[in-house]
């Protein structure tokens, strides 16, 4: 995975984010078409394999045991139950399954043994297997990799500066360390954040800049709109504006042209037209199913209808290989030249002021 060298400073990235929306969307759509099939969107399924009872205090999360959200705590699911849900997901068009457990960190116990078995079973189905289990060390990452784990999700959530306003039980550096452990084990990295928590545009870009400064940016970058859940500290936050979501997706697409930009939480508050704008701006994945861990998500039939309307097809998994390598500099220079040629052609077609004579109109 590579980054766009034009926007490898915070100042340049902020200017990009704040550029006229139509220009921003056009640039993002152009880059998206250079690196991805714009009519393919990956359908992923997120399964909450262990729900609630988390000791962390993430202000947005209804699974924290510190908040009263009426969420029923559920133990780790049985292996065959999870495999059955994965089979249903595959039959419905999903090529990726992400298993989420409300843990602060992975522990070397029977529950982890069961998760490893789940990974092995789903990997054997020819699907991309992703997991989000909290912090993990290098040895645990290696074990998951050997079991067939394709990707590990560990979001940064926001910028390092804003992070302390929403979480106190886990340090920002601990998140970066977990990403590093997954990366060094040879696991694909999925990491993104949430907008609408009260952060500024600079905070949103600050999160993306953390990925810019990594040795390799994430293969997947999920962009979530806050789902304000009653009982959490962020319950009174206003819904995210569609335009903010489009800006964040477009900026992410331009800065990380090879990565999969995932349109994640918050789609229930978005119209079909709003989601179409996100796809146009570079989103190339959604989560299918009526829930994202514990929060609502559009029903499967609604997504099928949306795909049909937009002419989208479900993307096959990268299970048998890696995301295709691209030559960024070469492609961008080629695209820049093509745009310059088109602009010159349009300019030459315009009548020169000296040659232009206004048409005379007789008035009776």
Spans of model-derived segments:
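Auxiliary Fe-S-binding modules of radical SAM enzymes
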Residues: 1-39, 212-364
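Glycine- and other small-residue-rich loops at beta-strand/loop junctions that grip anionic moieties
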Residues: 47, 133, 171, 193-196, ...
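Conserved Radical SAM active-site core
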Residues: 16, 65-192, 196-213
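Glycine-rich, proline-tolerant flexible connector loops at the mouths of alpha/beta enzymes
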Residues: 42-48, 68-71, 98-111, 162-163, ...
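Local cysteine-cluster metal-coordination motifs and their immediate loop/turn environment
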Residues: 48-65
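Residue-level signature of catalytic and energy-coupling elements of molecular machines
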Residues: 20, 58, 154
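Hydrophobic faces of well-ordered beta-strands that scaffold small-molecule active sites
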Residues: 41-45, 97-99, 129-131, 152-154, ...
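Short, composition-biased local secondary-structure segments
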Residues: 59-60, 87-90, 107-120, 145, ...
């Amino acid at each position: 995975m590579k980054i766009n060298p034009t926007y490898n400073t915070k100042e340049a990235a902020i200017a990009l984010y704040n550029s006229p929306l139509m220009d921003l969307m056009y640039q993002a759509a152009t880059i998206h078409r250079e690196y991805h099939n714009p009519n393919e969107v990956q359908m992923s399924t997120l399964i909450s394999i262990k729900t609630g009872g988390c000791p962390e205090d993430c202000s947005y999360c209804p699974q924290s045991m510190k908040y009263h959200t009426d969420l029923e705590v559920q133990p780790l699911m049985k292996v065959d139950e999870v495999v059955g849900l994965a089979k249903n997901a595959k039959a419905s068009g999903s090529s990726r399954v992400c298993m989420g457990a409300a843990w602060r960190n992975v522990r070397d116990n029977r529950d982890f043994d069961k998760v490893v078995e789940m990974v092995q079973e789903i990997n054997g189905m020819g699907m991309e297997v992703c997991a989000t289990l909290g912090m993990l060390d290098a040895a645990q990452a290696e074990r998951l990799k050997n079991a067939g784990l394709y990707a590990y999700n560990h979001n940064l959530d926001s910028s390092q500066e804003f992070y302390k306003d929403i979480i106190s039980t886990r340090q920002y550096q601990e998140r970066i360390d977990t990403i590093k452990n997954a990366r060094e084990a040879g696991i694909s990295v999925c990491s993104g954040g949430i907008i609408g928590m009260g952060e500024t545009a600079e905070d949103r870009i600050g999160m993306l800049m953390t990925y810019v400064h990594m040795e390799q940016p994430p293969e997947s970058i999920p962009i979530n709109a806050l789902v304000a859940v009653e009982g959490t500290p962020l319950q009174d936050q206003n819904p995210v504006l569609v335009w903010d979501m489009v800006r964040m997706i477009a900026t992410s697409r331009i800065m990380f042209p090879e990565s999969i930009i995932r349109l994640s939480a918050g789609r229930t508050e978005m119209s079909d037209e709003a989601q179409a704008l996100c796809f146009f701006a570079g989103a190339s994945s959604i989560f299918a199913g009526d829930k994202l861990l514990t929060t609502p998500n559009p029903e499967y039939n609604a997504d099928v209808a949306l795909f049909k309307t937009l002419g989208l097809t479900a993307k096959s998994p990268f299970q048998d290989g890696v995301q295709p390598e691209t030559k960024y500099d070469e492609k961008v220079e080629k695209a820049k030249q093509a745009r310059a040629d088109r602009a010159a052609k349009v300019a030459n077609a315009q009548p020169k002021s000296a040659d232009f004579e206004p048409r005379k109109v007789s008035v009776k």
